[in-house]
């Protein structure tokens, strides 16, 4: 197990390194000069002053040297300073934003797992019934709906028209922190984030349950007179969860992409909104730092997903 963990960790580090190189190259290919982010458009600067500022920031060095310098600082935990917020470090900005994003993703995935697994089991147990057809149609709609469209529609219906949920933010301005207020702001973004993932989980769960229900050991349990409830819970559910665990692990990356759109629509103060603002203002250190942290989180979750196999099914050995 330890050897497997080290092997996957090394692969993850390689993927993370490749990701940072790709983002660095793409940023260099974008039009414009990074030095423009430092210059006040209302203040005239001579070419000599701009060259001096470029040299001070290290932007006059070759690109490989710039990347290696950034990577060396990143390994030590120093991701640099924001170009737009001169007194704030990138690490500090990420630390203040990663909590809301993790909260949103955890709530959204929890809702998706509960809804997806429950409806998938019901559809499989009651195959070709009205609930099965209904859940299948809803799952198809959920899979087909883009995250940004679902977010805008949810915001319009539940916030603008029905007034059931706040229109944005994480807390009500000028009020003390309270759990009920946080949950009111969290409910709609988390529900919107969960729709597509719940639909995918439902489809996978239904297919896996149908396959498992036709196994010989399930027929044997039924022949022995075991109640259908215990056949599903004790003999079927655990084995049927294996492909679903794979899907849940892979949806973490999709949830990051969905969270970026949802945070921008609902003005949720998380990593997605930070990354969008950094792209709009060409804040390169923030873009690189946020990408590094998001990529690391996705890779760690994928490793934990692989290790979860051995917990769910002890017959599976990791090597």
UniProtKB/Swiss-Prot annotation:
Transcription regulation in keyword set: no
Bilayer topology term: Multi-pass membrane protein
Cited InterPro entries: BPD_transp_1_N, MetI-like, MetI-like_sf
Protein keywords: Cell inner membrane, Cell membrane, Membrane, Peptide transport, Protein transport, Transmembrane, Transmembrane helix, Transport
Chief site of localization: membrane
Any one Gene Ontology BP term: peptide transport
Compartments in which it is found: Cell inner membrane
Superkingdom of the organism of origin: Bacteria
Gene3D superfamilies: MetI-like
Residue ranges occupied by any ABC transmembrane type-1 domain in the UniProt entry: 98-305
Keyword GTP-binding applies: no
Residues spanning the membrane: 9-29, 102-122, 138-158, 182-202, 242-262, 284-304
Record-level GO cellular component terms: plasma membrane
Record's function text: Probably part of an ABC transporter complex that could be involved in peptide import. Probably responsible for the translocation of the substrate across the membrane.
PANTHER family to which the protein is assigned, alphabetical: DIPEPTIDE TRANSPORT SYSTEM PERMEASE PROTEIN DPPB-RELATED (PTHR43163:SF6)
Family statement drawn from the similarity comment of this UniProt entry: Belongs to the binding-protein-dependent transport system permease family.
Quaternary structure and partners: The complex is composed of two ATP-binding proteins (BOV_A0347 and BOV_A0348), two transmembrane proteins (BOV_A0350 and BOV_A0351) and a solute-binding protein (BOV_A0352).
Stated name of the protein: Putative peptide permease protein BOV_A0351
């Amino acid at each position: 197990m330890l050897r497997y963990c080290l092997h996957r960790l090394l692969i993850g580090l390689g993927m993370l390194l490749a990701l940072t190189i790709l983002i660095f190259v793409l940023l260099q290919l974008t039009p414009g000069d990074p030095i423009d982010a430092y210059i006040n458009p209302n203040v005239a600067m001579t070419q000599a002053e701009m060259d001096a500022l470029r040299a001070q920031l290290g932007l006059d060095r070759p690109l490989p040297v710039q990347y290696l310098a950034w990577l060396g600082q990143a390994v030590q935990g120093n991701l640099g300073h924001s170009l737009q917020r001169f007194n704030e470090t990138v690490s500090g900005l990420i630390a203040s934003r990663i909590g809301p994003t993790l909260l949103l993703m955890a709530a959204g995935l929890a809702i998706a797992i509960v809804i997806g697994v429950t409806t998938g089991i019901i559809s499989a147990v009651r195959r070709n019934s009205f609930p099965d057809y209904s859940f299948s149609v809803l799952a198809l709609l959920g899979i087909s709906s883009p995250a940004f469209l679902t977010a805008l529609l949810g915001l319009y219906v539940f916030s603008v028209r029905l007034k059931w949920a706040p229109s944005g933010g994480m807390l009500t301005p000028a009020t003390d922190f309270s759990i009920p207020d946080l949950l009111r702001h969290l409910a709609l973004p988390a529900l919107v984030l969960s729709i597509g993932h719940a639909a995918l989980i439902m489809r996978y769960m239904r297919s896996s349950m149908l396959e498992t229900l036709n196994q010989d050991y399930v027929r044997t349990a039924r022949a022995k007179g075991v109640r259908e409830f215990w056949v599903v819970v004790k003999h079927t559910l655990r084995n049927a969860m294996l492909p679903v665990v794979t899907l849940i692990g892979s949806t973490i990356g999709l949830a990051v992409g969905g969270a970026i759109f949802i945070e921008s629509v609902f003005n949720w103060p998380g990593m997605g909104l930070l990354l969008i603002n950094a792209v709009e203002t060409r804040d390169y250190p923030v873009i690189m730092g946020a990408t590094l942290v998001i990529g690391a989180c996705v890779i760690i979750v994928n490793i934990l997903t692989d290790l979860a196999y051995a917990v769910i099914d002890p017959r599976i050995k990791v090597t």
